[in-house]
Amino acid sequence: MIHVAGSARSRVSILAPLHPGPQAMSDDMCHAGAMDSAHVDDVSARYADFARFEVRGRTPVYLAWARGIADDAATCELIAGLPRIKRQPVLVFAAARHAGSAETEDYDAFREFLHAHWAEVEQIVLTHSTQTNEAKRCAVLLPFLSMIPGPLSLVEVGASAGLCLYPDRYSYRFTLDGGATRELRPAELASSVTPTAAPVLDCDLRDGIPAPRRLPDVVHRGGVDLNPIDPADPDSRAWLRSLIWPGQQAERVPRLDAALDIAAADPPNIITGDLVEQVEAAVAACPAGSTPVVFHTAVLGYLEPPARLEFVRRVTRLCADAGAVWISVEGVTLLDEVAAQVPEAIRRNKGIFVVAVNGRPLATAHGHGDWVRALALD
């Protein structure tokens, strides 16, 4: 068992024995997460929460838009006409920008554009998904992946273009407690990709998260998505750029483009279908002699509660029967059994993500991979 060094407070082991599978999830695990709270159908409250918990201090443009919509009954009514799962602020805002909205903090100007171009925005919303594919989330996954004996078969559910399936192809610069840095680089990349194409992922490892000393030995890259994105398709690449938040393009667009190039040169095996129904098939495709690692980042909030419960049941069984390891990086309240194990102060912060291995919370993390912090349990 590997422990995190650090304070005198009792810290959870970063990697408890990974087999058998996750702790049993309760049958009533069906009501956590901002997507499923009591006011999920209240557009005003949903956008107010988005402003308060998700974008404050991160993107002034989206903060202004979300606050404006929260206080704008006519625009709330417009958005309420969308299917519930399509009312997500990130999706509506990305669709508006994709349709040509200026990235302005002037809410009145944004409102005028949104109402004037609603038919186009609505069509984009209905035909696209929030498939944010942030390769930097690999920096959050790597400390845990590097502790699993290889070789590994990675299975990402909700994979989008599959950019998080290449943790061994990226370079990393970790900042440790005290300010020291640790760098990791791939020994070699696919022959069709030059080493300079590997993006460098910066991440702070806080409160004793150990710096990975090696990149994982990945022998299979697979997954499931309702609408897998072709990393070589120009229109798909343009949509992924629209999903990047205003003010973050200078850092994230070059990283996205580099990661898409890596994926296009060595495409993953992503099954088109429902992640609940197809997770077993994705694991069955893993080669013998490898450890299947089923993982997901910021995905389960887009499932209805019964589907989320069924997914947990199935992945739990895969861990027990197929020797799989399950890594979840999700909003703090999305998995009841995970949320029950973290301090109340953390549960109150809807913007926090929790990293759990086999249903056991081990760390909190930034949603886009800026930092990961060892979880202190009382």
Report each predicted region and the residues it spans.
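Non-catalytic accessory regions outside enzyme or core folds
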Residues: 30-81
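N-terminal amphipathic/basic-hydrophobic helices that include classical n-h-c signal peptides
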Residues: 1-34
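Conserved beta-strand signature within the Rossmann-like core of class I S-adenosyl-L-methionine
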Residues: 322-330
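A short SAM/SAH-binding and catalytic strip from SAM-dependent methyltransferases
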Residues: 292-305
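C-terminal region signature
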Residues: 334-378
